[in-house]
Each structure stands twice: as structure tokens, then as C-alpha cells.
UniProtKB/Swiss-Prot annotation:
It comes from the Eukaryota. It comes from Ovis aries. GO terms for biological process: proteolysis. This is Pregnancy-associated glycoprotein 59. GO terms for cellular component: extracellular region. It is an enzyme of class 3 (hydrolase). Belongs to the peptidase A1 family. It is found in: Secreted.
Length: 15
């Protein structure tokens, strides 16, 4: 998704 504003900075960047 690109919203690394959650607990998963590395995982959110790809999701």
C-alpha cells in the first residue's frame, strides 16, 4: 500500500 505509518514499516511499503 505504501503507507508505512503502521507497525510494519518494511511490510507496509510493499503492501
Amino acid at each position: 500500500r505504501g503507507s508505512n505509518l503502521t507497525i510494519h514499516p518494511l511490510r507496509n511499503i510493499r503492501d
